[in-house]
Amino acid sequence: PIHMFDMMRFLFGEVESLHAIGSTHEYKEVDDFSVLLKFANGMHATLATAADASWLFPFERVEVFCHHATLLTREMESLTCSSNVEGHFTVQTMHQLPREERWGYVQEDRAFIDSIVNNSPPLVTAFDGLMAVRIADAVYESVRSNKPVVIKQ
């Protein structure tokens, strides 16, 4: 889930606080989580993850709902977009792209190389990694305390 926290920050901004519940099923450590995140801009999001889920696809999906619009990804295989209340939608499939491109590795490498060649700030910094770890730590803290946790910036 740490990569999902990173992606949520990229898409929606800084996480202000969160409240999580967790349970232990297959492993000694807490392995299932449900997290409600509140962002500094007033948005909120949920994340559910299970370490003991089956191997049925999609392993990961993102659903975004706003202003009578919906975006839905399915395991980086497709993107479904609906932008009105009538229910019309479009589906873009990416399954024909090589995995490295479909999952963003090519674009990530290109952005990193461009930042070196052009002496420009990288798109991803150590601060981004730090914040993802702080959010993950806050999830465990919230599970232990059963209270919301404010994320230190």
Regions found by a protein language model. Name each.
Residues A40, A111-Q153:
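C-terminal helix-rich "cap/oligomerization" subdomain common to oxidoreductases
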Residues V30-D31, N84-E86, A136-D137:
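Short secondary-structure transition/capping segments
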Residues L56-R61, S82-G87, V91-T93:
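A short, polar/proline- and glycine-enriched secondary-structure boundary/capping micro-motif
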Residues A69, N84, N146-V149:
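Juxtamembrane helix-loop transition sites at the ends of transmembrane segments
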